[in-house]
């Protein structure tokens, strides 16, 4: 059985458990692809649930299974841990991979870690309470940079997602056309990205070049960034299209 199938079965079981117990039930963090599977499941349509990651436009989220009308407002078990260097002067330029590697190196499971947001030398890690306790007590180094970790407020303005608007001239909404324009490369070079499985839509690998993007889809091209697709702005005089995206910066 595929991993996503196992996850979907577990999420549906939580919905049944919530209905039976008369209380909110919460999952661990799930990927965008797993969220999409849940939202598309015909069986899930019969249950009440919501997805939340602890911050606006979170990519990794937990499922809160239940009904606010029946159980009151949910209280998702998500914590935010702020990480910063002990000395900014000697801090390295750390990446998402660096922080994630340091976290997993403590023996923490990926499923209890949500989004990792980086702004300059500071980082905000969304996680479940068990991981938060371990991070605060044990995370002391990321690569060669000594750091401190502490529980913090998730609603920190500087960590809210920032987007840069883009307008791209493309032949169509086909994924290969938008990918090439977004990455600033030729269609042939874009083909190699598809062959290497480096193009994702809503967290899922897409190798079908003719796939057509829909408004609200999240396009991610490894090595070139991520953007929200906002659809066609207008058709040009040469029968091409000006499409709008918001690139995460």
What is each model feature region?
Residues 1-176, 182, 205, 212, ...:
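Ferredoxin-like alpha/beta domains used as RNA- or RNAP-binding modules
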